[in-house]
Regions:
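Short glycine-rich, flexible loops that bind phosphorylated cofactors or substrates
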Residues: 54-56, 102
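Structural motif
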Residues: 1, 45-49, 73
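Short beta-strand/loop segments at the ligand-binding rim of alpha/beta enzyme cores
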Residues: 17-20, 64-74
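C-terminal functional extensions of proteins
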Residues: 71-141
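Internal active-site segments that recognize and position negatively charged phosphoryl groups
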Residues: 1-20
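Adenosine-cofactor binding site in Rossmann-like domains, unifying the SAM/SAH pocket
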Residues: 23-37
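A short, aliphatic-rich alpha-helical micro-motif
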Residues: 40-41
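A short acidic, amphipathic alpha-helical/loop segment
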Residues: 11, 57-64, 84
Length: 141
C-alpha cells in the first residue's frame, strides 16, 4: 500500500501487490483516496508521503494503519524527521536533511528540481522498536 503517487511507484508492482491511494488518480494502480477505509485494513505495509501531514490526512491514515497492524513508513522529501511520529505507529521515516545550507538555499531560490547530492542527504530514522515483528493470524483484519 502506497499513499501518494511517488515517481516510479510502478516498480513496486514488480515485487508486490500494489495499491496506490491518490487524490489525483492518473494510472491503473491509483485508487481514489476516499477508499482508504477499505484498502488500508488489508495492507501489510503502508508507505505514505509526508504530504499527508501537510494535507491533514496523516492522523486518520496512521490510525487505520495501526488498526491493521501494518508496518508503516513515512517517506519522501516532505517527510518530517520527527520521532513523535513513532508514537503514532510509524516505524521508520525515510526523508532528507540539509547537508549544505548554502547549496540548498541556492537550489531553492533558483528553482532547481534536484537537491540530493551535496545540498540534501537522504536518511532513515527508525523507531527504537521498529524491528518488532507484527504478525496477523488468520481471520484478523
Amino acid at each position: 500500500m502506497v499513499i501518494g503517487h511517488f515517481p516510479r511507484v510502478e516498480r513496486i508492482a514488480e515485487h508486490a501487490q500494489l495499491t496506490v491511494l491518490e487524490r489525483n488518480c492518473r494510472d491503473e494502480w491509483d485508487t481514489p483516496d476516499p477508499a482508504c477505509e477499505y484498502v488500508i485494513p488489508e495492507a501489510d505495509y503502508v508507505f505514505m508521503t509526508g504530504v499527508t501531514l501537510i494535507n491533514k490526512t496523516a492522523t486518520r491514515l496512521l490510525r487505520l494503519a495501526q488498526e491493521a497492524q501494518a508496518h508503516t513508513v513515512m517517506v519522501g522529501p516532505s517527510a518530517v524527521m520527527a520521532p513523535a511520529l513513532f508514537a503514532r505507529g510509524v516505524e521508520a521515516i525515510a526523508g532528507s536533511i540539509v547537508a549544505d545550507p548554502e547549496a540548498t538555499r541556492f537550489a531553492v531560490k533558483s528553482g532547481a528540481g534536484k537537491l540530493f547530492g551535496s545540498a540534501l542527504q537522504m536518511c532513515v530514522l527508525e523507531a527504537p522498536d521498529a524491528h518488532t515483528t507484527r504478525k496477523r493470524t488468520a481471520g484478523e483484519a
